[in-house]
């Protein structure tokens, strides 16, 4: 009946916001695709919001300003240690593509050879605390990452944090040769995970499940036909061109996503245990 129809749409037609971990970039393609696909769904309207260096994603979700956020699983655990009450619901990368990029032919044979050098880093980032402790890098001269690739290009001894999906390719496009040590190969591998609050899961389980279901559709779609999300992301980013973006998607498919795309989003509880032990 008409009354029943009104009831069902009002019960489920809801708008939710997914706050990203950074400005629009290729590893977020499946999330942006979900927003583009709102026209095909009448269950939930998904709005995706850009992050950035001044955006505290875990805080925004924990305080209820947005419903969902994308962040590294170690950041989620750090927030939970302060009582945030957050839970990962959808893994979009098997590990965050943190990498340490350095100049070739500067005497680096292992991560220990980076000790004593200047390092452009996002101050306070959790993986670096672990790397420093694990590999005894006590003399590194840390300074805040600004995104100025020119400084790196001019400073042979410097190394820099970035995403392996983008930073080496961006530097190569500027004619700067690099080598890298990924944080994953050093043994630290937090998920890149969409999360929400325990409260949201308890009070709106159908809504949370609907968002997960929508993402399970949008992620493979964004890989099969990457043009819509690529055009959008390139329109928002001056730092990445089509070649760098396409290369990032190929790296994602090779190293960061399950070979069976129907398993994108799935998580292994043991990985959270592994990470918790590393963060002690």
Task: Give the positions of each predicted feature.
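Short, glycine-/small- and polar/acidic-enriched structural segments
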Residues: 14-145, 149-162, 181
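Glycine-rich beta-alpha junction loops
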Residues: 24, 166-167, 185-187, 236-237
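Extracytoplasmic/secreted envelope proteins and their assembly/folding machinery
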Residues: 28-31, 58, 73-76, 111, ...
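A bilobed periplasmic-binding-protein/Venus flytrap-type ligand-binding module shared by bacterial periplasmic
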Residues: 33-35, 98-108, 191-207, 260
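Periplasmic-binding protein-like
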Residues: 92-101, 172-200, 212, 251-255
